[in-house]
């Protein structure tokens, strides 16, 4: 799917923040478009601005990237600071991998590598907490590509965990979520990542390239189903968006 021409002016927009020149929102973007949303793709790393308010957008997603949330680059600090906009307005926000780590930094938490320098690159187990189980069913394994993780910041609910990096999915307030794994991954993206990122598969804890594709064959159906359930919970559709403030008032 070509997202570059997706500028529907009469459809609710979801802000998409990417970090590389040729990055794609992948399956997440595809599913949002199927739900009737237009994608407003911005890349602050290359000079794009971010909105002062979320009133013009139905939600926002900050995706991953090869950089660290601890990097000194101006765009990294800009994005971390900007996340307070959807958090304060309680607008739907999703951080994926780096995006989740940026949200944690905004909340005063820390991002760091594993004490034994282990990475997660490939498919790894995921276990929902009781809070996570109350929300939805979760896949048993998910696709990962990271060498840093985040702690649990004050005010965040832990939804899912794993043995190597214990904080895998969190919720902050009624509408903000951060996930360490990559449900957006398409087959084409896996080919690209495992080709360009081949040296990273030599890092401790990483899986070999063939295991990535074997894992996708086994686990991707469950990940796809999870993403559909998550989007139902998080944003809904353009015609029937989730009213998080109403849900909060009913709790």
Language-model features and meaning:
Residues 1-74, 78-91, 201-251:
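N-terminal beta1-alpha1 cap of cysteine-dependent amidohydrolase-like domains
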Residues 15, 40-42, 61, 94, ...:
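Hydrophobic/aromatic beta-strand patches that form the interior of the parallel beta-sheet core
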Residues 22, 47, 68, 101, ...:
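Surface-exposed, flexible loop/turn segments at secondary-structure boundaries
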Residues 25-27, 51, 71-73, 104-106, ...:
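Short glycine-/acidic-enriched loop or helix-start segments at secondary-structure transitions
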Residues 29-31, 57, 74-77, 108-111, ...:
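Short, glycine/charged-enriched secondary-structure capping and boundary segments
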Residues 57-58, 62-132:
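Cysteine-nucleophile active-site neighborhood
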Residues 107-188:
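Pocket-forming structural segment of enzyme catalytic cores
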Residues 174-176, 180, 184-212:
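C-terminal helical/coil "lid" or tail adjacent to the Rossmann-like core of SAM-dependent
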């Amino acid at each position: 799917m070509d997202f570059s021409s997706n500028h529907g002016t009469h459809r609710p927009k979801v802000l998409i923040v990417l970090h590389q020149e040729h990055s794609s929102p992948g399956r997440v973007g595809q599913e949002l478009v199927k739900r009737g949303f237009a994608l407003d793709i911005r890349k602050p790393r290359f000079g794009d601005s971010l909105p002062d308010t979320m009133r013009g957008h139905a939600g926002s997603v900050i995706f991953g990237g090869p950089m660290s949330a601890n990097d000194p680059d101006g765009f990294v600090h800009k994005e971390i600071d900007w996340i307070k906009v959807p958090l304060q307005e309680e607008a739907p926000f999703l951080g994926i991998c780096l995006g989740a780590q940026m949200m944690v930094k905004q909340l005063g938490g820390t991002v760091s590598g594993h004490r034994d320098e282990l990475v997660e690159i490939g498919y790894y187990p995921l276990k929902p907490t009781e809070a996570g189980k109350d929300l939805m069913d979760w896949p048993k394994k998910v696709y990962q590509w990271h060498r840093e993780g985040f702690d649990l910041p004050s005010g965040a609910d832990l939804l899912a965990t794993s043995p190597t990096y214990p904080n895998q999915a969190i919720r902050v307030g009624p509408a903000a979520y951060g996930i360490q794994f990559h449900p957006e991954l398409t087959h084409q993206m896996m080919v690209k990542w495992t080709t360009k990122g081949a040296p990273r598969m030599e890092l401790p804890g990483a899986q070999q390239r063939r295991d990535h594709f074997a894992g996708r064959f086994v686990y991707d159906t469950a990940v796809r189903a999870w993403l559909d359930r998550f989007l139902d919970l998080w944003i809904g559709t353009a015609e029937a968006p989730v009213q998080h403030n109403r849900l909060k008032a009913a709790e």
